Amino acid sequence: FVLEEALKNDISLETSSAFDIDIVKNLYDNGKIDKNIEVVCNGFKTDDYLNKISDLINNGFENIIPILDNYRELDKLTESIDATFDIGIRIASEEEPKFEFYTSRLGIGYKDIIPYYSQKIAEHPNARLKMLHFFINTGIKDTSYYWNELFKCLRVYARLKKIAPEVDSLNIGGGFPIKSSLQFDYDYEYMVGEIVYQIKKFCEEEGVEEPN
């Protein structure tokens, strides 16, 4: 029900597991979406998840974007997809030392992305790099740590954009905090505006087009 209401607006979808792909197929079978909808496929990808992503692309879904969490995933997708397809790369953030759950094993390191693109993606016959995925596990907060990681991401984007003009999207993950007490005070509008402003300003200074 929630998805059906959301789909009345111009939205994209995001998946994080093989089960979510089944939901996408069900929405299509019931006429709730068409094959042009953008679906960003995040999360660690089991073979089942990768196979279901490949099935969507092979069956004519035109805007499926699997986000690579590791080097293996592109090899698996290449083996099972018969058409051209878009991909994204998750940037492995350098996490705060005190964070309880270590998740930066997911993604490709800042320093490795340009070499990986040059060696594996630039001349790939079918894959096209479209998106960078920037995820901070502590969420979107007005802290020096958050802004520092965002600017690292933007430096990678700017360098990539100069050699890979097809890269045109930035997916910002981590989520906003939610109200958990009466004292909760978070300026959502300020943070959204500041993130967009900093991205636009950085790209103007670097002489590259800002991302979607």
Residue ranges of predicted features:
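Active-site-proximal beta-alpha core segment in soluble small-molecule metabolic enzymes
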Residues: 1-169, 198
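Short glycine/threonine-rich loop-to-helix capping motif typified by GTGT followed
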Residues: 2, 142-148, 179-192
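Glycine-rich beta-strand-to-loop/alpha-helix junction loops that act as flexible
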Residues: 137, 170-179
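Alpha-helix-loop-beta-strand connector modules within alpha/beta enzyme cores
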Residues: 153, 191-204
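Short, intrinsically disordered, charge-balanced linker/junction segments flanking boundaries
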Residues: 206-212
